[in-house]
């Protein structure tokens, strides 16, 4: 039985600590988007088999199994269970792949899949960071700062600061063009606050330039090449999708936009975690029975310019087919929500462009990569 994505929606992605969602609880914003998605598809909430929610730091306001909390805040009945997944940056792509595998095995027919992260309200590494002392001393790479991994990749592959800045500028230019063309309108669900609604992403910088980027100091190491401009910003946001069987979609008047053909998760050295998409993409191609030339477009989450550049080069991708509307450097990277965004964005782009096949992929902290192969229905 094939698993299909029938619709998706996301909140605006806004800058942590100073953006429009900094004062909104993550469970609240996730509940609002889940409710919006169900209402616009006129689906009976009781028909949802499970809510699968990705979250990189599931504690504080994101704790106590936020997947189950969203059952209540999203207006679903108590009969619908909920679970929280943590594969760091790949958490909500994992939720989609888990739903797809359940559908293919006959263990369910309709799942609400997504993720959420408030990087304003739940700090990176959580509230009580406590690494294993022996592992930290004997293999410190296991806990390496993500910015250091970006520097490592840049050094290993000879990616200059200027090349990283050109990549970042292109991401902002693509996202600005998409914003002006209204390409984000259908995917955005406004978030209601007591005094206003948040309607629009606020990480995109239409005014940015190579000249302005050139003045920024290195962000992670003295004399390094990675800056704030060539890193994805700390971001608040949430994204959800409806993943169901083709049979369920037909019976309930839902229109599939893409089928989940295959998924893959691989490991890599943690201090080079940004290279994870290379092996994950190679494996998902193998499982789908495709060649790289069979794929019409790619969504590659841009954690950093350096790792994105190397992934594009190593996989032999045409840059014109990658991140048509920009990536996380421009749009933002709320950790637990990004996997759902890139997967569903790839599905939507197949409809918009008339393409047949897409791959969504991303790197994962700790040294992993994840990828999903999609085919237009």
Question: What are these regions, as identified by a protein language model?
Answer:
Residues 149, 184, 194, 261-330:
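Active-site pocket-lining segment
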Residues 26-42, 66-70, 95, 146-153, ...:
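Short, well-ordered amphipathic alpha-helical segments that serve as non-catalytic structural scaffolds
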Residues 21-90, 94-111, 116-132, 188-200, ...:
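Conserved beta-ketoacyl condensing-enzyme motif
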Residues 10-11, 23-32, 40, 163-251, ...:
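N-terminal extracellular/periplasmic Venus flytrap/periplasmic-binding protein-like
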Residues 1-26, 211-275, 279, 286-287, ...:
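Condensing-enzyme catalytic core mediating Claisen C-C bond formation in acyl metabolism
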Residues 55-109, 129, 141-148, 207-233, ...:
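Conserved catalytic cysteine-centered active-site region
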């Amino acid at each position: 039985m094939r698993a299909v994505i029938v619709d998706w929606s996301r909140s605006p992605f806004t800058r942590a600590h100073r953006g429009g969602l900094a004062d909104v609880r993550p469970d609240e914003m996730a509940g609002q988007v889940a409710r919006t998605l169900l209402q616009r598809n006129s689906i009976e909430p009781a028909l949802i088999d499970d809510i699968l929610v990705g979250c990189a730091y599931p504690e504080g306001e994101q704790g106590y199994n936020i997947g189950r909390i969203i059952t209540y805040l999203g207006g679903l009945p108590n009969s619908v269970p909920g679970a929280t997944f943590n594969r760091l940056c790949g958490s909500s792509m994992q939720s989609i792949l888990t739903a797809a595998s359940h559908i293919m095995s006959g263990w369910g027919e309709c799942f609400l899949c997504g993720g959420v992260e408030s990087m304003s309200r739940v700090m990176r590494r959580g509230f009580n960071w406590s690494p294993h002392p022996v592992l930290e001393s004997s293999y410190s790479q296991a806990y390496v700062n993500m910015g250091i991994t970006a520097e490592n990749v840049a050094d290993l592959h000879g990616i200059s600061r200027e090349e990283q800045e050109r990549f970042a500028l292109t991401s902002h230019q693509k996202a600005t063009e998409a914003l002006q063309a209204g390409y984000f309108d259908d995917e955005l669900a406004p978030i209601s606050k007591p005094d206003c609604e948040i309607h629009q992403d606020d990480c995109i910088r239409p005014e940015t330039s190579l000249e302005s980027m050139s003045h920024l100091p290195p962000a992670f190491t003295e004399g390094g090449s990675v800056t704030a401009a060539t890193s994805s910003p700390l971001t608040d946001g949430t994204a959800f999708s409806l993943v169901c069987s083709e049979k369920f979609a037909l019976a309930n008047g839902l229109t599939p936009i893409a089928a989940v053909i295959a998924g893959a998760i691989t490991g890599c050295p943690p201090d080079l975690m940004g290279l994870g998409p290379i092996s994950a993409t190679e494996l998902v191609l193998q499982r789908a029975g495709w060649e790289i030339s069979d794929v019409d477009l790619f969504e590659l989450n841009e954690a950093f310019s350096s790792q994105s550049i190397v992934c594009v080069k190593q996989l032999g991708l045409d840059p014109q087919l990658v991140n048509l509307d920009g990536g996380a450097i421009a749009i933002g990277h709320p950790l637990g929500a990004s996997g759902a965004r890139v997967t569903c964005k790839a599905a939507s782009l197949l409809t918009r462009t008339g393409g047949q096949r897409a791959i969504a992929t991303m790197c994962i902290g700790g040294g992993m990569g994840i990828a999903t192969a999609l085919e237009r229905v």
